Amino acid sequence: MKILVDENMPYVEPLFGDLGDIIPVNGRTLTAEQVREADVLLVRSVTKVNAELLSGNNKLKFVGSATIGTDHVDLAYLAERNIPFSNAPGCNATAVGEFAFIAMLELAQRFNSPLKGKVVGIVGAGNTGTATAKCLQAYGIKVLLNDPIKAAEGDPRSFVSLDTIMAQADIISLHVPITHTGEHKTKHLFDEARLKALKPNTWLVNCCRGDVIDNQALIKVKQQRDDLKLVLDVWEGEPTPLPELVPLAEFATPHIAGYSLEGKARGTFMLYQNLCQLLNITADKSLLDLLPTFNIKAVELATAPNEKALLQLARFVYDLRDDDKMFRNTFLNENGFDTMRKNHQHRREFSALALAYDGQSEVDWLSNLGFSGVGQ
């Protein structure tokens, strides 16, 4: 069995090595000719899976995407061809949630404006939006959720309108899929008019899709309003973001919010489980066995951490400033965006760091935030 796999997908060899011959490929430049003889195709979001790519292949048994979203996959075409498909919903939700939370802590420190006491509006309450809310609520932050689709489906959580978030939130964090049509289309959801309407000193965080914000309009509005603070992990026109926009963001990264070791492993592992199920064989590998030991054994806390100390704990796990600096230095290079993604040293999630503290009940919130070793 020939397993064609994106070269940037981790842990493929230990998980799929027993199932067939693994052929690594560049996901962004993948051609129909390369796919022609594949039995299994494993991709990430940089690969467009459609008739153009697959029409020459009559052997394909399974397509898997190690991603939350599926907007890069023509699902109708796969269904028409009866080709089983699986993605990995929620695989990197924890990573994205922690990234957004860390970015907010970093902004709070940079501008001497504590996160505690602010109101955060989350637009899109799926896996990543929910994970972001979980971090914020663990820390005691008031969260407003906006998701008209979830609300219509009967989700029991309390939802508010986007206008309410615009009026009440100090921070807005975007977590919607990209949709181009329909009542709730998200392309340019934040257009020039909405960007201009942001209340003074709003922090705007985008970890979903670049097209959700009109990037040209964002440049125009930000140049007029220095009070707005931007955290941008995604960009219109990836992998070539508008060069004028990058310097206007407080933190800028190349679509890596979901790039935790745990998240990447989880994505590949979910595809492994689904392929095994399809082939009717036992999935006998373990996710935990894939992950290396974290380089910091444990941190002993003398007192329950304040916000400054919490940021320091977060930096033990992931220092966002490093990726921000590297991105600014390399994004204008040829293939700079993709090269940084490809060579990214995947960070760990909070769960990799064990904390020790005598007054356990005082730090239950750290456990709820995801850290190990403390709390109930």
Swiss-Prot record:
NAD(+) binds at D147, D233, G258. It is found in: Cytoplasm. PROSITE patterns: D_2_HYDROXYACID_DH_3 (PS00671). It catalyses: 4-phospho-D-erythronate + NAD(+) = (R)-3-hydroxy-2-oxo-4-phosphooxybutanoate + NADH + H(+). Signal peptide: none annotated. It holds the Pfam family 2-Hacid_dh. Homodimer. This is Erythronate-4-phosphate dehydrogenase. It comes from Shewanella baltica (strain OS223).
